[in-house]
A protein has these predicted regions:
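C-terminal accessory "lid"/substrate-recognition subdomains
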Residues: 2-12, 174-224, 237, 241-325, ...
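Walker A (P-loop) phosphate-binding motif
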Residues: 41-104
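Phosphate/Mg2+-binding loops and adjacent switch elements
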Residues: 91-219
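Generic C-terminus detector
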Residues: 318, 325, 331-377
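Short, high-confidence coil segments that cap the C-terminus of an alpha-helix
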Residues: 83, 143-146, 162, 276, ...
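Conserved beta-strand elements of the Class I
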Residues: 86-88, 167, 279-282
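A transmembrane-helix-recognition feature enriched in membrane-embedded lipid enzymes
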Residues: 2-53
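Residue-level signal for inorganic ion chemistry
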Residues: 28, 68, 118, 152, ...
Length: 377
């Protein structure tokens, strides 16, 4: 059976024939989304709070948009500020649904590739679970020192209340602006959650940012419990559909390739060395071509590339050793290293701007827990 995902993803960028045919179905989907939100608003469905602040890093554009590097950067920088941070994730692609602890040695098959990557990169407690509330409770029970929780994805998971949301966009923005399946949106934009929205722009260094707006001092004075902070990833893309819709943005959070690559045994090598070697690359992220372009911009000549779908099974791919060394993302390496330990993972590095970090801390500050993990009063 042919894979229709590429055609559908392309159709989501314009309001063309395929999107228009699917548009009536998106009305039904939209009605269900609206009804679900209404039931939560009327407290028919209850969204409990955990005793520590919960920051959600999510998206409304379905699929991979570059959340994980942002999650890793946020966790590291909150930790550098002296906070004890824990991470929750759904663990997409894993074999089970129950709540489970994740370590650097965990199997991606059992817990998902992104949670393993976060555990390895951040060295903080990580839990996965379809029920994010239950996973959060288990996380805090086993790690009572935790003061703040970062959720990797979960913007639409309303069963767990959150205190702050970072909504990530890539260069596709809102696509054609329509809901699934006629468009790429999981829910209508702007997100109707607290009535107050801000947009933060996350960009790679090789893309020219157009009119980024900064969050101003008035933002710090808002009293809304659930500030929705939106993040837009602007990436290199020469052919942007004319109908592409983009939200306004507030912050630029650069994302660049590291200057080194690493193998499964910890061996590292300067990325510049690959400029004079035979190299092939693969990527199973939301926009694989972006990773390939970033390697090319470093002067690396790629003899072949393999663009895989987000969370694809690495066991099914064929790697030709005649095409040279294999470069991949850290996320792909979590699974690829199980049978290709000599592959080189190239980290994507993101740094949260100081202004954005201060804004985040200002909004979660009133609920920050004590050193023993109990909510302050």
């Amino acid at each position: 059976m042919p894979d229709i995902r590429p055609a559908l993803q392309q159709a989501w960028l314009t309001q063309g024939l395929i999107a228009r045919v699917l548009w009536p179905v998106s009305l039904i989907y939209g009605a269900l989304v609206w009804l679900r939100k209404l039931l939560y608003r009327l407290d028919v469905f209850h969204a409990p709070h955990l005793p520590v602040p919960v920051i959600v890093v999510g998206n409304v554009f379905v699929g991979g948009v570059g959340k994980t590097p942002l999650v890793i950067a946020l966790v590291k920088q909150l930790t550098a500020r002296g906070l004890k941070v824990g991470v929750l994730s759904r663990g997409y692609g894993r074999s089970g649904d129950g709540s489970q602890s994740v370590t650097a040695q965990s199997s991606a098959t059992e817990v998902g590739d992104e949670p393993v990557l976060i555990a390895r990169a951040c060295q903080v407690p990580v839990f996965v679970g379809k029920n994010r509330l239950q996973a959060g409770q288990h996380l805090l029970a086993q790690n009572p020192q935790i003061q703040v929780i970062v959720c990797d994805d979960g913007l639409q998971h309303m069963a767990l209340a959150h205190d702050l949301a970072l909504c990530v966009f890539d260069e596709r923005g809102l696509g054609n602006g329509w809901l699934l399946p006629a468009g790429p949106l999981r829910e209508p934009w702007p997100v109707d959650r607290s009535g107050y929205l801000q947009v933060i722009t996350l960009s790679t260094s090789n893309y020219e940012i157009e009119n980024p707006q900064r969050v101003n001092e008035q933002l710090l004075g808002k009293e809304e419990e659930q500030l929705q902070v939106q993040v837009q990833v602007l990436e290199k893309d020469k052919e942007k559909p004319k109908e592409l819709k983009k939200p306004k943005a507030d912050f630029v959070v650069p994302r660049v390739l590291a200057d080194f690559a690493q193998q499964a045994d910890g061996t590292t090598q300067a990325l510049s060395i690959f400029c004079s070697q035979k190299v092939q690359a693969l990527a199973g992220i939301g926009k694989p071509q972006v990773f390939f372009d970033m390697l090319t911009d470093k002067g690396i000549v790629l003899l072949a590339t393999k663009a895989l779908a987000d969370h694809d099974d690495m066991r099914t791919i064929h790697i030709d050793p005649e095409l040279g060394e294999v470069l991949c993302t850290e996320k792909d390496a979590v699974k690829l290293w199980n049978f290709q330990p000599t592959a080189w993972a190239v980290p994507l590095i993101t740094e949260i701007p100081e202004e954005l970090l201060n804004t985040i801390l200002a909004h979660i500050g009133p609920k920050l827990s004590s050193a023993h993990g109990h909510q302050t009063t």
